[in-house]
Amino acid sequence: MAAVQRLLRASASGGAAAAAAAARRRMSTAVAPEQTPAAAAFPFAAAAGRARQRVAEERNVQWVFLGCPGVGKGTYASRLSRLLGVPHIATGDLVRDELASSGPLSVQLAEIVNQGKLVSDEIIINLLSKRLKKGEEQGESGFILDGFPRTVKQAEILDGVTDIDMVVNLKLREDVLVEKCLGRRICGQCGKNFNLACIDVKGENGLPPIYMAPLLPPNNCMSKLITRADDTEEVVRNRLQIYNDMSQPVEGFYRQQGKLLEFDLPGGIPESWPKLLHVLNLEDQEEMKLATA
């Protein structure tokens, strides 16, 4: 459990700096490949190539999904998790599980979430380390992280304990994000997520039109739907503002490493999923899975 131990040490006082220094030492000893015009135009191309090779050889990719609250990180990360056979680790789920457990952090977390604030580095690292330890004990290999890192400090800590192959940054215009978040519902019985919003936004001011069909629940879930406590317009807009203020340094951190893939969602799952697979060069992987299903 060396990786988790290093993660815990890094989260202690002064640990972030040590982790960042270790990451810089690794980077300084690597010889940067000569960039082709295509690689210069698309900084994520080299990272995508390395990640695709890792998929082909070992099926244990180590990816990160970034994006505003409600953009769909969990949806696309979980789909890729099933496609590639690696665990999907969502820090939002870790927080909600802790809230439901009535554990020592539950009261503190409830106050933070209900106010629309971001959970602190210390708490997130504590929850993530527990999840990594559990996965290692179960023999898991690789991961897709969803919702972590949110700060450069977290990115430095993560860089100090493991290699990230690629970072996918999902993007969606804010007016659509707000409407999407306000339509979210959870079945209080089965725990599945749904969305009642039917989004049909016209293109204007250079922005493309976006259509997202509602993700409706089956009849047996309809009467059991609940709204998350943090899905009010005031809280949603506050969370988006906080995220936007904090996300740019993290995006810059991974952009500088040539690992950041910016992906603008063109619509709902039917429109976005095939295009995401195309960008990741995973269409063949999807076809093979469907053929053997």
Curated annotation (Swiss-Prot):
GO CC terms of this entry: chloroplast stroma; cytoplasm; mitochondrion
Keyword Nucleus: no
InterPro entries assigned: Adenyl_kin_sub, Adenylat/UMP-CMP_kin, Adenylat_kinase_CS, P-loop_NTPase
Highest taxon listed in the record's lineage: Eukaryota
Intracellular or extracellular location(s): Mitochondrion
Region annotation (LID) ranges: 183-231
GO MF annotation, one: ATP binding
Reaction catalyzed: AMP + ATP = 2 ADP
PANTHER family xref list: NUCLEOTIDE KINASE
Function: Catalyzes the reversible transfer of the terminal phosphate group between ATP and AMP. Plays an important role in cellular energy homeostasis and in adenine nucleotide metabolism.
Entry similarity comment: Belongs to the adenylate kinase family.
Name of this chain's protein: Probable adenylate kinase 1, chloroplastic
